[in-house]
C-alpha cells in the first residue's frame, strides 16, 4: 500500500526568484515555503559548479529537513520559468537524478501550471515576481511563446523606495543619543507585505500611518501607497515601463482574433500580485489606457469587458497548486523524464522551452 501511495504522489517544486515552494502532489497548499537567492544570483552568469554548490544544500534540506520524506525513487514535478539559464536547469536535473535518486522528473512552465488551478484554458498570464514581471498569452490551452514578454519591475522596486524614504528619516533621529538601525531589504519587504496597498482610481482621501512596534518605526500613509505606484508608473529604475505597459504591448502584438479573449481573462499571479488592490488597479489602468488608444477604438466593447480571472487560491500559490494538480494527471507521467532516459542521454534530454515550442508548433 505504501509503495502504491509513493508511486502516486510526487514532490512538487515551484521555483521562484525569491522563494521556493515544496509539497506533495494532490494537496491544496505547499508544506513549506523557503526563501532563496536564485533571483539575485541570476543577475550574473554562474558555472554549473557554482549552481551545484548553492542548489544541493537547499534541495537536500527541503526533502529531508522540511518535508521529512526520502526523495529516492520518487517523482518530481518542477514548475519553472520559461527562460531560466540552461546551466541552471541541467544542474538541477543532475542533483535530482544523480544525488537525490529521483525516479522521474516532469518539468512544466509555471505560467502554464497556474491554469490548472483555475477553470480557464485561456488567459493572459501576468506573473508579478520579485525582480521582474513576465507575461505569456495562453489560448485554449496552447501557449504563445512568441508573445512572451518581460518587464523589469517587481517587488524589489517597491522595497527600494521604502528603504530610501525611511532611511532618510532614520538617519536624522530625534534623539541624537539613540542608535537607529537602517532599514534593510528584508525589513522593507516585510513593510511592503504588511502595510502597503494599491490605491484605486478613486483614491482614499486619508490613509493612516502604520506603526511597527518591533522595529520602533512608523510608515507614513503616503509611503504605504506611493511604494506600490512603482509597479504602475514605471519610475525608479524600471526603464519607464510598468506592468500596464507590458500588458498593452502584448495585446498589440497579439493576433486580432484573440485580443478580446486575452482582455476578458487577465490572470495576475505571483507574490507581488498579493499586494492588496494591485490586481484590480491594473485592470482599471488597462481599461483607461486602451480607451484612449486609437488601435483599440474599434474594440471598445472588448475593452469594457476587461476583467480578472477568478482565482480560488492565493495568487502567490497558484503555480504550486497547479503543479500539484498536474502531477496527478496522466499527462505528467507521459511527459516525465525517467532516470533511465536521463542516464542514457547523459543529461541532454531537457531541451529549452522555446526549442520545444518551435518543434511542436
Regions found by a protein language model. Name each.
Residues 58-66, 224-261, 281:
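Phosphate/ATP-binding catalytic cores across multiple sugar-kinase/actin-like superfamilies
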Residues 174-182, 295-361:
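Acidic, glycine/GT-rich loop-and beta-edge segments that sit at the periphery of enzyme/chaperone cores
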Residues 251-268, 272-307:
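Structured C-terminal portions of repeat-based eukaryotic scaffold domains
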Residues 1-5, 102-126:
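Conserved phosphate-binding catalytic cores of ATP/NTP-utilizing and phosphoryl-transfer enzymes
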Residues 5, 13-19, 118-120, 125-134, ...:
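A short acidic Gly-Thr/Ser loop motif
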Residues 2-95, 104, 145-147, 166, ...:
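Conserved phosphate-binding loops in N-terminal lobes of ATP-dependent enzymes
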Residues 80-89, 196, 200, 264-285, ...:
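Glycine-rich phosphate-binding loops at beta-strand->alpha-helix junctions
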Residues 139, 143-240, 244, 262-265:
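Phosphate-binding glycine-rich/basic clefts of nucleotide- and phosphate-handling proteins
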